[in-house]
Swiss-Prot record:
Name used for this protein in its record: Ribulose bisphosphate carboxylase small subunit 1B, chloroplastic
Transit peptide in keyword set: yes
Organism: Arabidopsis thaliana (Mouse-ear cress)
Subcellular compartments: Plastid, Chloroplast
Pfam families: RbcS, RuBisCO_small
Quaternary structure and interacting proteins, as annotated: Heterohexadecamer of 8 large and 8 small subunits. Interacts with RBCX2.
One GO term of the biological process aspect: reductive pentose-phosphate cycle
Disulphides: none
An example Gene Ontology CC term for this record: chloroplast stroma
Chain's role: RuBisCO catalyzes two reactions: the carboxylation of D-ribulose 1,5-bisphosphate, the primary event in carbon dioxide fixation, as well as the oxidative fragmentation of the pentose substrate. Both reactions occur simultaneously and in competition at the same active site. Although the small subunit is not catalytic it is essential for maximal activity.
InterPro entries xref list: RuBisCO_ssu, RuBisCO_ssu_dom, RuBisCO_ssu_N, RuBisCO_ssu_sf
Additional free-text comment from the UniProt record: There are four genes coding for RBS in Arabidopsis thaliana. The basic functional RuBisCO is composed of a large chain homodimer in a 'head-to-tail' conformation. In form I RuBisCO this homodimer is arranged in a barrel-like tetramer with the small subunits forming a tetrameric 'cap' on each end of the 'barrel'.
GO MF term (any one): mRNA binding
Length: 181
């Protein structure tokens, strides 16, 4: 027992282990590195998009209703809807179809603070499509909802049942009577 205590003490106080790692001496100055700078003020030589961004228009904020994700885009076609649903399914999210008969956009009815009755909660069309693997199944449900409620806004949401959060939501159908203004 004495020999094991002696050997462990000898290992701890060994001077070879204290010099294995050099101490931190600080950061090196960047002055020692040669730097050549191009004195060109031509904006086209910059690698980023910074100069061209000012030329891009944005969606007009006045008189336009805010919906869900992709609301700044024109209405999605059936092919584009199918691609969005395919994206939702690839991410293993559960698709769900919801509809709203009066307000298809966020509004404040009972006060100015966010709450339950502020237009974010819609009526669910049937149950979520657990086990759905094809976007055609989801679009079929959207069509059924359109037939039942032709004057309703219809949206598709993607729910992550692992994290218990809604990950995506977008408008699939706006009623013909609706105008953006």
């Amino acid at each position: 027992m004495a020999s094991s205590m002696l050997s462990s003490a000898a290992v701890v106080t060994s001077p070879a282990q204290a010099t294995m790692v050099a101490p931190f001496t600080g950061l090196k100055s960047s002055a020692s590195f040669p730097v050549t700078r191009k004195a060109n003020n031509d904006i086209t030589s910059i690698t980023s998009n910074g100069g061209r961004v000012s030329c891009m228009k944005v969606w007009p904020p006045i008189g336009k209703k805010k919906f869900e994700t992709l609301s700044y885009l024109p209405d999605l076609t059936d092919v584009e809807l199918a691609k969005e649903v395919d994206y939702l399914l690839r991410n293993k999210w559960i698709p769900c179809v919801e509809f709203e008969l009066e307000h298809g956009f966020v509004y404040r009815e009972h006060g100015n603070t966010p709450g339950y009755y502020d237009g974010r909660y819609w009526t669910m069309w049937k149950l979520p499509l657990f086990g759905c693997t094809d976007s055609a199944q989801v679009l079929k449900e959207v069509e059924e909802c359109k037939k039942e409620y032709p004057g309703a806004f219809i949206r598709i949401i993607g729910f992550d049942n692992t994290r218990q959060v809604q990950c995506i939501s977008f408008i699939a159908y706006k009623p013909p009577s609706f105008t953006d203004a």
